[in-house]
Amino acid sequence: MKTATLLAALSVLAGALAAPLAGDSALHRRSLPRLGGVNLAGCDFGIDIYGNSGTPACPGTEQVGHFIADGANLFRLPAGWQYLVGNNQASTSLAPDFFAQYDALVQAVISKGAYAIIDVHNYARWNGAIIGQGGPSNQDFANLWTLLATKVTSNDPNVIFGLMNEPHDLDVSTWAGSVQAAVNAIRAAGATSQYILIPGTGFTNANAWFQGQDNALLGVTDPVGGTDKLLLDVHRYNDVDFSGTHAECTTNSLDVLSSLDSWLKGNGRKAIVSETGGGHTTSCETDLGEFLNGIKEDYPSVLGFAVWAAGSFDPSYVLSITPTNGVDNQLFDIAVKPNLP
């Protein structure tokens, strides 16, 4: 959203998933279930929309079990690029202390059979400069994903790679080349069974996909073949300017969801709404609930959602769904929980 806001696998499974994916692996062919859950924010705190960094505040793992008990099976885990690599964009290693905190979240999620989205929350930027467009090189971006794909997965199929949070104000054709470099790096690192979220422009807004602004990104290819593992990343907020910064909702966005669903079917693609949310108001209890129900009904074109946000957010934050003393707030109980898988 537009504010400041990894692995032991059974060796048999890892070996099976690392095998060539020519079409005879049942795990490779399996479809994702209907997904629903939350963003656990904090490891991204201090990152602004220009990719400048501040001070992270990674949450503990206790909320993972809490939300799984509620019915969640998807956790998006935002992290700042600078924090992951010790503020060195060309680093050949991950920052050990920070990554240990982040990896604990990933492990907590996948150990319970849920899905973890690894989200680099930098708005396609590093300290104000755009990836591949005057800022970090595509190789720097690819190196980051090589490190993450190597460290995070052990080829665990419950990891989903969210390449970049909310790119904006950039050349989309050039950005498609940066995205392709990251996809290639992930696959070359041996992470061949995981899904990858392709981030669109305009803060990953839904309209940019079906209105054609993101057409260049449809040309991104997967070295393992096909496009079934390349999911489209979508964000949608229902406040007056769709920014996710206001307490009141003014639409349920079902018209946008219908257009997206039709477009996805027409193009043979699938998407995840990795950010949406609402304020602690009656309008958002209604509109967010209707929107999430619409996502549920649009499965499998739209595979699911992750609501913004819990984790290290104080319960008083305008879009908070952080539980208080283990108790969910009213927005979560009314709008989110009934639409979880």
UniProtKB/Swiss-Prot annotation:
Signal peptide interval: 1-16
Family matches, as Gene3D superfamilies: Glycosidases
Catalytic site: 166 (proton donor), 275 (nucleophile)
Alphabetical UniProt keywords: Carbohydrate metabolism, Cellulose degradation, Cleavage on pair of basic residues, Glycosidase, Hydrolase, Polysaccharide degradation, Signal
Broad enzyme group: hydrolase
InterPro entries: Glyco_hydro_5, Glyco_hydro_5_CS, Glycoside_hydrolase_SF
Reactions performed catalytically: Endohydrolysis of (1->4)-beta-D-glucosidic linkages in cellulose, lichenin and cereal beta-D-glucans
Protein name listed in UniProt: Endoglucanase 1
Gene: CMC1
